[in-house]
Amino acid sequence: MRAYKQTDHQVAFGWFGGWSGEGAFMKSSLAGIPDSVDIVSIWDNGTNLSEAQRKDMAFCQNMKGTKIVYCSIIGSVGDKLTPQNILDNWEEMGYNSEQEAINAFWEYPSDESNIQAVEVSIRKYAKAIIDTLNLYGYDGFDIDYEPVAGPYTGNIVDKDEHLFFFIDELGKYLGPKSGTGRLLVIDGEPQRITTKPEIGTYFDYFIIQAYKPGSDSNLDKRLIDGKVWGPGLVETFGGVMSEELITKRTIMTENFEATDAAMDGGYPYTDRYGNSMKSLEGMARWQPRNGFRKGGVGTYHMEAEFGTSPEYKNIRRAIQIMNPSSHSLLKN
């Protein structure tokens, strides 16, 4: 399985929620995820890890070759990493607001026209994220970037120039430019990074929340020419990356937060030939209109389909469709 994951293939991805790493019920453990899943992004409970969580993650990384990445919404410098004593005691420390105290700790300037100081502060924050990933042993970072859908705003994401400082610093340690083999991925709305498209070259994967897409046409538009939820990825990044590379780095995902959808494999979907199926299968079968191979497919709250028979039946089937093998990944 570890050798398979080193090959050039369409990957299986999932956001995992409710992680505890313990208990007889494997729904809350990474060890219960199919061996053939390539990348798991921890959606919550991803810091202050217990001994059980550390062992659970190490088992999947070392025995299965699964990449475990940490997911976080990105907004402003200091989010989730500002020391608690500053958040609790900013008034006693003489600051006029919590935000003023946060900015002081991270040396973020009150005058944003001082772009050099802005850059230094943003890079300091990015390095703190790297330190956190290293502390817990993660294989990479999943940036939840949703400036419109959230909307998640802040002094990093509100300006593409600021976002570039952040991504460029992360890119020294993660992603295709780093040479480390560690992952830097972005989910949500990467297609909206229109004023500095070179940011796109720093990511291993663009992970698109193509929830309830309904058809091949919807996925084609999200990838190529847009008009579904902003521009297409190729529209945004095509000036700095080849269409083939963009396509090979694109993972389409379905929302399994609703248990009935998870158990059923998603929502109604019709391919370009008129065949009807559920959406996760449709994504797996989808061959992009441009003729290039996609990066893969995934699910949000992947753990919600643990209760299928066999467990994780739908993602197993999607993997088998994308990467046919001589033996089925579905258990008998």
Regions found by a protein language model. Give the residues of each.
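Secreted glycan hydrolases and related glycan-binding modules that recognize and/or cleave
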Residues: 1-332
